[in-house]
């Protein structure tokens, strides 16, 4: 199945008239939390540019979960937001601050886009960091289009979220696991865990 809370936001389908290789296309642009724009011909429903099904991480896996082995990646335009997480993405105002951020990150599971949620264990793994967060990337605020230039403007945020999934007490529930929160995590000394910028407006021609 798809990963939780990464479904497209409801209000981010934008009508746009574009010219591709000399051909005028009445298109729809679907802006997503993942930082992708999926572009379709609004008369035929066909993708304007190829959408590739690419293999995505399958581990860690919460017992009982069955994930799709692939996810759709548009070949154009490039992602408008940074995706996935590594130590190079952490706040680095000073070497000491960066080292502290790495120590914080070591408590979590992280990796490329679509890394699955993991079970949080007391004294161990605290969950999987999603980037962009469950709130995006882009979200309900959508995008704006200049009808004369066909440039689309997308506001987005570079943020993280952590779906905290824990094993339940069998005396309290028949469900083996439950999600108790969907918050984020702070970086060292009250700073964000990521390096800036934290918000952008991307113009795509």
Show which residues each predicted segment covers.
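Beta-sheet-rich non-transmembrane sensory/scaffold domains
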Residues: 1-205
